[in-house]
C-alpha cells in the first residue's frame, strides 16, 4: 500500500481547496513528488457510495486534462470504440481492472459493484478518470487513458503540483 502521510493530506487539501475525503492511498505521485492521484474507498465514511476509485488531485494535471477534453478527443474515442473491436475489448478489460483494484479493498458496496469511471466500459465521458487510472495502474492497462496521457504536456515541469 502507498501510505498517506499528514503532509500528503495537507498537500491534497491545498490542491483541492477543501479537506480531502477518505483518502485510502496515494496511487500516483507526480515526478515532482507531490500526490497527483489518490485511491478512495467505494463507500465514504458518511455512507455515500463513491465509485471513483482513482481521483486526480493535482490542479496542474486536472487543468491540462480539462484542456484536452475541449479538443473533441472524447468524441473521436467514442467513434473508435464503436468500430474497433480490439480497442473495445481492451477498454472493457480496463473497466474490469478498475473494478478488481477497487474490490481488492474488500469493501462491499453493491450500489457500485459494476460501476467503474469515465464512461467505461462502453464509452468515454471523462478523461480525468481515464488518465488517473492510467497513471495509477501503469501503461498498457487502459488504452484510452494511455492515449490521453500521451497527449498531455509535462504539467509538473515548471512548478510543483501544489
Enumerate the predicted regions with their spans.
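Preference for intrinsically disordered or flexible, low-complexity segments
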Residues: 1-162
Amino acid at each position: 500500500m502507498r501510505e498517506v502521510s499528514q503532509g500528503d493530506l495537507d498537500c491534497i487539501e491545498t490542491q483541492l481547496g477543501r479537506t480531502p475525503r477518505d483518502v485510502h492511498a496515494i496511487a500516483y505521485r507526480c515526478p515532482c513528488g507531490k500526490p497527483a492521484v489518490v485511491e478512495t474507498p467505494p463507500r465514504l465514511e458518511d455512507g455515500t457510495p463513491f465509485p471513483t476509485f482513482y481521483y486526480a488531485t493535482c490542479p496542474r494535471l486536472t487543468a491540462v486534462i480539462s484542456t484536452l477534453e475541449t479538443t473533441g478527443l472524447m468524441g473521436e474515442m467514442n467513434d473508435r470504440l464503436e468500430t474497433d473491436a480490439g480497442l473495445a475489448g481492451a477498454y472493457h478489460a480496463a473497466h474490469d481492472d478498475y473494478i478488481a483494484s477497487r474490490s481488492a479493498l474488500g469493501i462491499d458496496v453493491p450500489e457500485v459493484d459494476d460501476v467503474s469511471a469515465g464512461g467505461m466500459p462502453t464509452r468515454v465521458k471523462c478523461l480525468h478518470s481515464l488518465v488517473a487510472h492510467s497513471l495509477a495502474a501503469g501503461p498498457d492497462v487502459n488504452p484510452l487513458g494511455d492515449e490521453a496521457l500521451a497527449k498531455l504536456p509535462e504539467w509538473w515541469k515548471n512548478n510543483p503540483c501544489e
